[in-house]
Amino acid sequence: SRGLGDVYKRQIEDTIHLLSYPDFTQQGTGITYQISPQSFYQVNPKQTEKLYSTALAFAGLTGNENVWDLYCGIGTISLFLSQKAKQVYGVEIVPQAIEDAKNNAKLNGITNAQFFVGKAEEVLPQFYENAKKTEKITDDTASTGCTDMLRPDVIVVDPPRKGCDEKCLDTMLAMSPERIVYV
């Protein structure tokens, strides 16, 4: 039998657009999302709004925070949080979802969100190690450049059913954010 890992290996070769609107607005969030067939999206808009509002409340954003959003999909949580954050970095394994996230940021005029393709357990540790090499961190170092990525204020994770990989969890702890919001 096939394992869950096989789901990501299979690509949809050809799709035919039969009938739908090209985009829609998630009620209550003020963000318009375009979604491709290969991308995941929460299908219950009322509960999605409650979920994102709860995540925002737990994140405690004031507009000055740097945020990592792991397993970000098409950027739904990232873009929602970007309205109250200084900078948001999203990571997702599905390339088409990251394309959707970037397009959704443009569509909504959001400039404080960046998105990266890859496994969270590979991308986050890689950024962390590279940032440590690039900038020496001390208590009096101003939060600029790589430091924003190295020492985020908040990390939000909305992982698949299997949960977060141990390497990802270890890196999150090493980054010492003020808050981790696990959706």
Residue ranges and their predicted role:
Residues R2, D6-V183:
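Rossmann-like S-adenosyl-L-methionine
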